[in-house]
Amino acid sequence: DLVEFGFMIRCANRNSQPAWQYMDYGCYCGKRGSGTPVDDVDRCCQTHNECYDEAAKIPGCKPKWTFYFYQCGSGSQFTCRKSKDVCRNVVCDCDFKAALCLTGARYNSANYNIDIKTHCR
């Protein structure tokens, strides 16, 4: 779910951007998105949105509200705990990949809270 995703971002990005700073970033972070992603951070969010779209095709799966378990270890090491529930596994994997992607992407504060009507066509 989105709350766990926020914690996972915090786990992966220790001493970096807080999760809330990704909620209104670029064309895809924190919103459905359209147009060309503004940078690598935004591309991570676009891919995450697409992953959630695929997860939503699993009967009964609601990715934004599906709780899962993961373990945050030392450093920025974290893993999804496998479940018998396919939806939970897929959603955790979506969030895991996005958190890793965000770790490797350079955050540009100029892309926070941009005018999507101008920049996201």
UniProtKB/Swiss-Prot annotation:
Superkingdom of the organism of origin: Eukaryota
GO CC annotation terms, alphabetical: extracellular region
Tissue expression from the record: Expressed by the venom gland.
UniProt GO MF annotations: calcium ion binding; calcium-dependent phospholipase A2 activity; phospholipid binding; toxin activity
Disulfide-bonded cysteines: C11-C72, C27-C120, C29-C45, C44-C101, C51-C94, C61-C87, C80-C92
Main location per the UniProt record: secreted
Protein's GO biological process: arachidonate secretion; lipid catabolic process; phospholipid metabolic process
InterPro entries referenced in this protein's UniProt entry, alphabetically: PLipase_A2, PLipase_A2_Asp_AS, PLipase_A2_dom, PLipase_A2_dom_sf, PLipase_A2_His_AS
Annotated compartments: Secreted
Function: Snake venom oligomeric phospholipase A2 that has potent presynaptic neurotoxicity. Chain B is not itself neurotoxic, but it is essential for the neurotoxicity of textilotoxin. Subunit B possesses a very low phospholipase activity.
Family recorded in the similarity comment: Belongs to the phospholipase A2 family. Group I subfamily. N49 sub-subfamily.
Protein name: Basic phospholipase A2 homolog textilotoxin B chain
Natural source organism: Pseudonaja textilis
Upper classification of the organism: Eukaryota, Metazoa, Chordata, Craniata, Vertebrata
